[in-house]
């Protein structure tokens, strides 16, 4: 791919991303405004029910809720372009600051979980492919099937019951103990159970995918040729099969980033873990428009971005797709 075509390629990707985010923001804004509930309750609490009609009208004017929905959106979009995403009704501070205060916990839980899922699924998939049909393969298959069928909220409650209530060896809620915000060991202990749920809930699917892809590659004609040259099954798998499997695996893992982070939202709620998951639940419950809008926009933008990254990985790494692109470029040139 030549330099001008690369610029055009990434320019198209950037334009597609911006247009998708624009449409997403408009859709989320309209849906959040049309949802049932009273946002003044979030802002004023119990006092909202005691407001007179005149005071209610003044409050709606103050928050910009008296304007048409499209006018509200245009005003929100103009402010958002300058980095102003509005004030959280519940926390009485900028929505971006509220999210920033919680994002670290979610990124820690989701980031460590994603790295463990990526590493362990790759290792498990390779081991199961090498030992196809053995007791190890069957045991992993059965364990994965059972674990994958358990809902994350139920698995969370089960681990809390066993390790936090019965055995009392691990904390079952929060991100740290009172007064232990800077204690790394205490934070790590609070991370173990939620992290276990996140990893167990996603690990097996990707391990199965790696195993099946490797087994498909092992049946290809080039593997017979490699074995005829004296290469062992292990060498063929590592040098050839794994290399051909990685583009698909990397693109699927890129798409899965939002899915893994979305899984942490449920886990955070069950474990009362102070991250974006509990924040999203609170913003929806209290109809905190600005906070809910920014959370939804960030989540949607992450999904769109990861989809584009996955597509780019496939197009840039997979030699078959690169060859097709080269043929198309050659046909376009005079």
Q: What is the predicted role of each segment?
A:
Residues 21-27, 146-161, 253-258:
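Hydrophobic alpha-helical membrane-insertion segments
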Residues 51-82, 271-282:
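Short hydrophobic, aromatic-rich alpha-helical segments embedded in or entering the lipid bilayer
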Residues 3, 65-122:
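An internal, D/E-rich "acidic patch" concept
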Residues 26, 30, 34, 127, ...:
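Hydrophobic membrane-targeting alpha-helices
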Residues 142-204:
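Membrane-water interface segments at transmembrane-helix boundaries in multipass membrane proteins
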Residues 21-71, 167-187:
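Hydrophobic alpha-helical transmembrane segments of membrane transport/permease proteins
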Residues 2-34:
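Charged, compositionally biased N-terminal leader segments and the immediate start
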Residues 6-8, 103-136, 181-334:
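Alpha-helical transmembrane segments of integral membrane proteins
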């Amino acid at each position: 791919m030549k330099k001008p075509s690369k610029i055009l390629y990434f320019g198209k990707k950037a334009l597609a991303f911006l247009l998708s985010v624009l449409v997403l923001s408009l859709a989320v804004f309209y849906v959040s405004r049309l949802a049932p509930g009273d946002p003044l309750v979030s802002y004023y609490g119990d006092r909202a029910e005691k407001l007179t009609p005149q005071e209610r009208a003044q409050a709606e004017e103050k928050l910009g809720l008296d304007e048409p929905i499209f006018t509200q959106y245009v005003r929100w979009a103009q402010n958002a372009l300058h980095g102003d995403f509005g004030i959280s009704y519940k926390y009485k501070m900028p929505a971006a600051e509220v999210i920033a205060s919680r994002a670290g916990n979610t990124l820690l839980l989701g980031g460590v979980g994603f790295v463990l899922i990526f590493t362990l699924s790759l290792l498990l998939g390779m081991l199961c492919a090498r030992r196809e049909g053995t007791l190890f393969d069957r045991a992993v298959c059965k364990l994965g099937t059972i674990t994958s069928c358990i809902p994350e909220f139920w698995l969370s409650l089960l681990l809390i019951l066993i390790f936090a209530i019965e055995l009392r060896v691990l904390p079952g809620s929060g991100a740290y103990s009172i007064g232990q915000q800077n204690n790394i060991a205490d934070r790590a202990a609070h991370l173990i159970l939620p992290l276990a749920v996140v990893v167990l809930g996603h690990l097996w699917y990707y391990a199965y995918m790696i195993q099946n892809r490797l087994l498909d590659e092992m049946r290809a004609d080039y593997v017979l040729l490699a074995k005829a040259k004296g290469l062992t099954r292990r060498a063929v798998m590592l040098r050839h099969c794994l290399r051909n499997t990685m583009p698909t695996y990397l693109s699927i893992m890129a798409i899965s980033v939002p899915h893994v982070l979305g899984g942490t939202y449920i886990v955070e709620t069950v474990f009362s873990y102070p991250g974006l998951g509990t924040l999203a639940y609170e913003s929806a419950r209290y109809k905190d428009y600005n906070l809910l809008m920014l959370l939804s926009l960030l989540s949607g933008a992450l999904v769109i971005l990861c989809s584009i990254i996955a597509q780019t990985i496939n197009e840039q790494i997979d030699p078959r797709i690169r060859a097709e692109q080269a043929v198309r470029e050659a046909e376009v040139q005079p």
